[in-house]
């Protein structure tokens, strides 16, 4: 690997490296995933002229880090929602307010995690950096799923993960194709089908793993008791989850090592690409690592608030838990990534937009979902891959219609419009789901915990 140095980790803060980071600029670009390319469109350059005049190096480094990490994004305006959610918790404010503020606070945090993993990739090299980016790409969804699981809210876990897949396949991709088609209405937008084909093969594998446990419950009904059927579905799901994780590991090897060229973001010589080419690390390795740990802890805190208040928000807003989990959580939680995908579609860079939507859907379907099943298994919680007939049907239709939409390697606004309309149809279906809260929480086959109390200072959540 070109440009490797033997000196220990160190770099002067804010883009003035004292040594050469691992990998050349070209190699570092290869280590970036579509998630990072998408999120980078929401970043803004920092003006550090005032900070550079601070005489004390420690204070100057801290202020520089603060400027780059907190204020270096166009979503910085949403950061006040984080302390607001915490204060509302201590003051005993209505839980729907805490739920809404926590969701808003998660939006910039998800984008900043992407920024920090990219900063670390400057030091780890393109391969390890790409692996880090791929692993942390959906950290918010994984944290919410695990916290909901520890509260025994299995339905919320299933709904939120399914919603993330549907959102990426229909909403994000549909909006990107529609906006890109309108912005480039006088010319045909084209993209490389190869990476899309790989993602669809894996998504179909994931769908098969969801379909078979569902069919077992129907085909074996009457031949065995409900308890036996439940055990069969649980055992099948755990076995399938191991297979899904193996397939995801193979996908990472395929993406980062053997066929990396298929997943490279398209490289056109324009102003944006020149900017990307000149990017350097703006914070040191250990500063980036510390910020990443801190951001992850804050995401975990806000995710706990979201999980603990979702039923109360459902009652107050007269919305079903299924609608909030499948529609609202993915839209707000991934707003930064979604906006970036649309921006690149406007720039006629559909390969990046596709990489965001399909890559994220694949990661959730083949990594986050089976990992959640394994974690539930370890915790002694019965969670399977049977998401229900309606939910599994929505997943199947979404994968099939998206595959047909992208089969010819070209795009126009009508394709995006159809995907968006499909998403609206699914949203309407879950919007009219008015099952009572307790039934809504258990209708996927698992009894929710009757009383989950989370005490954080003066704030107490009950569900």
From Swiss-Prot:
The reported result of mutating residue 25 to D is: Loss of autoinhibitory regulation
> Which residue ranges are recorded for the region named Required for autoinhibitory regulation?
25-33
Q: Tell me about pH and activity.
A: Optimum pH is 7.5 for cytosolic pH.
Segments crossing the lipid bilayer: 69-89, 97-116, 128-148, 162-182, 198-218, 239-259, 282-302, 326-346, 361-381, 385-405, 412-432
Q: What is the effect of changing residue 443 to A?
A: No effect on transport activity
Q: Where in the cell is it found?
A: Vacuole membrane
- Carrying N-acetylalanine, the residues are 2
Instruction: Specify where the region named Required for interaction with autoinhibitory region lies, as residue ranges.
Output: 56-62
Give the Cytoplasmic membrane side ranges.
2-68, 117-127, 183-197, 260-281, 347-360, 406-411
Outline which residue ranges sit on the Extracellular face: 90-96, 149-161, 219-238, 303-325, 382-384, 433-463
Q: How is it used?
A: CAX1 expression in tomato increases calcium content and prolonges shelf life and may serve as an alternative to the application of CaCl(2) used to extend shelf life in numerous agricultural commodities. Expression in potato tubers increases calcium content by 3-fold without the adverse effect of increasing other metal ion contents.
Q: Which domain of life is it from?
A: Eukaryota
Query: What GO terms describe the biological role, i.e. biological process, of this protein?
Result: calcium ion transport; cold acclimation; intracellular calcium ion homeostasis; intracellular manganese ion homeostasis; intracellular zinc ion homeostasis; lithium ion transport; monoatomic cation transport; phosphate ion homeostasis
Q: Which GO terms describe its cellular component?
A: calcium:proton antiporter complex; plant-type vacuole; plant-type vacuole membrane; vacuole
Coiled-coil annotation: which residues? Answer: none
PANTHER family in the record, alphabetically? VACUOLAR CALCIUM ION TRANSPORTER, VACUOLAR CATION_PROTON EXCHANGER 1
Function description: Vacuolar cation/proton exchanger (CAX). Translocates Ca(2+) and other metal ions into vacuoles using the proton gradient formed by H(+)-ATPase and H(+)-pyrophosphatase. Involved in ion homeostasis in association with CAX3. May play a role in cold-acclimation response.
Protein known as: Vacuolar cation/proton exchanger 1
Protein source organism:
Arabidopsis thaliana (Mouse-ear cress)
Gene name for this UniProt entry:
CAX1
């Amino acid at each position: 690997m070109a440009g490797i140095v033997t000196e220990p980790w160190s770099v002067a803060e804010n883009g003035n490296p004292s040594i050469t980071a691992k990998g050349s600029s070209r190699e570092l670009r290869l280590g970036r995933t579509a998630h990072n390319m998408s999120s980078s469109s929401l970043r803004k350059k920092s003006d550090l002229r005032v900070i550079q005049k601070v005489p004390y190096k420690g204070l100057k480094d801290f202020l520089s880090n603060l400027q780059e990490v907190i204020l270096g994004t166009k979503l910085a305006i949403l950061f006040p929602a984080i302390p607001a959610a915490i204060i509302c918790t201590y003051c005993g404010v209505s839980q729907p307010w805490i739920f809404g503020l926590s969701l808003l606070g998660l939006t910039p945090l998800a984008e900043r995690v992407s920024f920090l993993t990219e900063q670390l990739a400057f030091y780890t090299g393109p391969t390890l950096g790409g692996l880090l980016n791929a692993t942390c790409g959906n950290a918010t969804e994984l944290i919410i799923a695990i916290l909901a699981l520890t509260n025994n809210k299995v339905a919320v876990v299933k709904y939120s993960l399914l919603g993330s897949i549907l959102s990426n396949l229909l909403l994000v991709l549909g909006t990107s194709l529609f906006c890109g088609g309108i912005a480039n209405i006088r010319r045909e937008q084209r993209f490389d089908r190869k990476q899309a084909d790989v993602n669809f093969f894996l998504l179909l594998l994931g769908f098969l793993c969801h379909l078979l446990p569902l069919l077992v419950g129907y085909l074996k009904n009457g031949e065995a008791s409900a308890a036996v059927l439940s055990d069969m579905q649980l055992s099948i799901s755990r076995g399938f989850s191991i297979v899904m994780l193996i397939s995801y590991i193979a996908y990472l090897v395929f993406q980062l090592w053997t066929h990396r060229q298929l997943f490279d973001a398209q490289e056109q010589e324009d102003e944006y690409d020149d900017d990307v080419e000149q990017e350097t690390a703006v914070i040191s390795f250990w500063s980036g690592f510390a910020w990443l740990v801190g951001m992850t802890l804050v995401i975990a805190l806000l995710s706990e608030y979201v999980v603990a208040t979702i039923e109360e928000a459902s009652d107050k807003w007269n919305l079903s838990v299924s609608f909030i989990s499948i529609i609202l959580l993915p839209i707000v939680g991934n707003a930064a990534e979604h906006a970036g995908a649309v921006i690149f579609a406007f720039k006629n860079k559909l390969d990046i937009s596709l990489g965001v939507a399909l890559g994220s859907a694949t990661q959730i379907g083949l990594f986050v979902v089976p990992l959640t099943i394994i974690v539930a298994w370890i915790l002694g919680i019965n969670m399977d891959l049977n998401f229900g007939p309606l939910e599994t049907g929505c997943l199947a239709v979404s994968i099939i219609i998206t595959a047909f939409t992208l089969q010819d390697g070209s795009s126009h606004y009508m394709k995006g419009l159809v995907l968006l309309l499909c998403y609206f149809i699914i949203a309407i279906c879950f919007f009219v789901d008015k099952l009572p809260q307790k039934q809504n929480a258990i209708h996927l086959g698992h009894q929710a915990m009757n009383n989950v109390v989370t005490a954080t200072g003066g704030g107490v959540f009950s569900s």
